[in-house]
UniProtKB/Swiss-Prot annotation:
Disulfide bonds: none annotated. Exists in an autoinhibited state in the absence of substrate protein, due to interactions of the leucine-rich repeats with NEL domain. Is activated upon binding to a substrate protein. This is E3 ubiquitin-protein ligase ipaH9.8. The gene is ipaH9.8. It comes from Shigella flexneri serotype X (strain 2002017). Residues 1-242 are annotated as: Interaction with target proteins. Residues 243-250 are annotated as: Linker. Belongs to the LRR-containing bacterial E3 ligase family. InterPro entries: LRR-bact_E3_ubiq_ligases (IPR051071), LRR_dom_sf (IPR032675), LRR_E3_ligase_N (IPR032674), NEL_dom (IPR029487). The LRR (leucine-rich repeat) repeats are involved in substrate recognition with target proteins. One of its GO terms (molecular function) is ubiquitin protein ligase activity. Residues 251-545 are annotated as: E3 ubiquitin-protein ligase catalytic domain. SUPFAM superfamilies: L domain-like. Keywords: Host cytoplasm, Host nucleus, Leucine-rich repeat, Plasmid, Repeat, Secreted, Transferase, Ubl conjugation, Ubl conjugation pathway, Virulence. Its main location: secreted.
Length: 545
């Protein structure tokens, strides 16, 4: 950084004489502003950066993370990028007309000044904005999430990406598309939007609109689903959720939420145990999740469900690692609809079983471990199928799609971790034919791919390390010998064959491929040996219907 001399004088005819205000005017104003600093502000550093920007005629000015409560009125007139994020700003001064990118996230702004006519990127998320000024026609991207905005001004035709999550919007802006080729992605999740304007259909089918967790009326949802399901629909893809966006953010103490799942004669002891976990990360959201779980279809209709949850909670209380994993999995489950809670319960049961397998529960029961692995494999394939299905839908709640495949195929595919009922299957877009095709695909891929998958599965490796230490050590030695003797040549041969010798990115990719192939070969051989021995001893079999 250049040393700053407040008495520095510029030579005559410098470029500074051509911009608004003189060099001395800038320095004098900035020095005065610096002297008015509040405790904790790094205005000295800010002034140093301002002067350096002016001296070097830089087009970027970065004053972020300096705990500033204000900015000087006269910013360098030549800048095209201004970053003042993560300060304590309540307002911004007049902005240079040359500005193209404005970053002012995580401040305390309640309003914005007039925006420069050439502005292309506006990033003002996490502020206290209640409205926006007119948006320039040049604007391409805008993030206004986590503010208090009630309505939006007209959107520029050029705007490609808009993030307006977590505001107080009650309606969407009007969309006018015409022949505009811009592919747009707009996020309006978690607002107060209750209806969708017909103008949304003016957008191209390559565009995406996200409106999850809004209080959309059932009439609006039905109308949109009917319209977007039409064979001649060519509008945008619309992501929604069955949540009404009105989840209660209040929660009761963790111990109270847990003890509610236990019989009265156990509640005192359970409460005492769980009081110790009140301050663990995500404990509050886990408490809210348990209360939401008690109101799901499965909790109301499935015999033994409460006992199942209580047994699971006992296991969590005995394992800090499992509890930490489970709290994290449940962290976002209360921010969406009932079926999101149900899908999270599925994932929590998977987490429990995989944890138990890794900790040794199935060390002496290879058949049970294979069954668990097979279920995890089937669930992975169903997730792939659900992901592909989501891409085909124009009006989609992703949660309902993922849960639909698990719930509707739980019995046929023997999915012990899947709930047997869901509330909103009707809006999932998953048809009976989709389910038949999915079942056939799972069985086909299981027949051809499961043993390879199982040989690389982490819990199986944990079992091998504990119970087949010598064989595991031999396999690891074989792998490292290959890395030392064969790996470099195999990577070089692959790069040469593809004409990419000397390409660093291609070398990394080729190296990863060779490593995967080597591990697949070595661990598959080890798996075949161990399974052949164990399954012949207890009469189990690798393939399962």
């Amino acid at each position: 950084m250049l040393p700053i001399n407040n008495n520095f004088s510029l030579p005559q005819n410098s470029f500074y004489n051509t911009i608004s205000g003189t060099y001395a005017d800038y320095f004098s104003a900035w020095d005065k502003w610096e002297k008015q600093a509040l405790p904790g502000e790094e205005r000295d550093e800010a002034v140093s950066r301002l002067k350096e920007c002016l001296i070097n005629n830089s087009d970027e000015l970065r004053l972020d993370r300096l705990n500033l409560s204000s900015l000087p009125d006269n910013l360098p007139a030549q800048i095209t990028l201004l970053n003042v994020s993560y300060n304590q700003l309540t307002n911004l001064p007049e902005l240079p007309v040359t500005l193209k990118k404005l970053y002012s996230a995580s401040n305390k702004l309640s309003e914005l000044p007039v925006l420069p006519p050439a502005l292309e990127s506006l990033q003002v998320q996490h502020n206290e904005l209640e409205n926006l000024p007119a948006l320039p026609d040049s604007l391409l991207t805008m993030n206004i999430s986590y503010n208090e905005i009630v309505s939006l001004p007209s959107l520029p035709q050029a705007l490609k990406n808009l993030r307006a999550t977590r505001n107080f919007l009650t309606e969407l802006p009007a969309f006018s598309e015409g022949n505009n080729p811009v592919v747009r992605e707009y996020f309006f999740d978690r607002n107060q939007i209750s209806h969708i304007p017909e103008s949304i259909l003016n957008l191209r089918n390559e565009c995406s609109i996200h409106i999850s967790d809004n209080p959309l009326s059932s009439h609006a949802l039905q109308a949109l689903q009917r319209l977007t399901s039409s064979p001649d629909y060519h509008g945008p893809r619309i992501y929604f959720s069955m949540s009404d966006g009105q989840q209660n953010t209040l929660h009761r103490p963790l111990a109270d939420a847990v003890t509610a799942w236990f019989p009265e004669n156990k509640q005192s002891d359970v409460s005492q145990i769980w009081h110790a976990f009140e301050h663990e990360e995500h404990a509050n959201t886990f408490s809210a999740f348990l209360d939401r779980l008690s109101d799901t279809v499965s909790a109301r209709n499935t015999s033994g469900f409460r006992e199942q949850v209580a047994a699971w909670l006992e296991k969590l209380s005995a394992s800090a690692e499992l509890r930490q994993q489970s709290f994290a999995v449940a962290a976002d489950a209360t921010e969406s609809c009932e079926d999101r809670v149900a899908l999270t319960w599925n994932n929590l049961r998977k987490t429990l079983l995989v944890h138990q397998a890794s900790e040794g529960l199935f060390d002496n029961d290879t058949g049970a471990l294979l069954s668990l692995g097979r279920e995890m494999f089937r669930l992975e394939i169903l997730e792939d199928i659900a992901r592909d299905k989501v891409r085909t839908l124009h009006f989609v709640d992703e949660i309902e799609v993922y849960l639909a495949f698990q719930t509707m195929l739980a019995e046929k595919l023997q999915l012990s971790t899947a709930v047997k009922e869901m509330r909103f299957y009707g809006v999932s877009g998953v048809t009976a034919n989709d389910l038949r095709t999915a079942e056939a695909m799972v069985r086909s891929r299981e027949e051809n791919e499961f043993t390879d998958w199982f040989s690389l599965w982490g819990p199986w490796h944990a079992v091998l390390k504990r119970t087949e230490a010598d064989r595991w050590a031999q396999a690891e030695e074989q792998k490292y010998e290959m890395l030392e003797n064969e790996y470099p040549q195999r990577v070089a041969d692959r790069l040469k064959a593809s004409g990419l010798s000397g390409d660093a990115d291609a070398e990394r990719e080729a190296g990863a491929q060779v490593m995967r192939e080597t591990e697949q070969q070595i661990y598959r051989q080890l798996t075949d040996e161990v399974l052949a021995l164990r399954l012949s001893e207890n009469g189990s079999q690798l393939h399962h219907s």
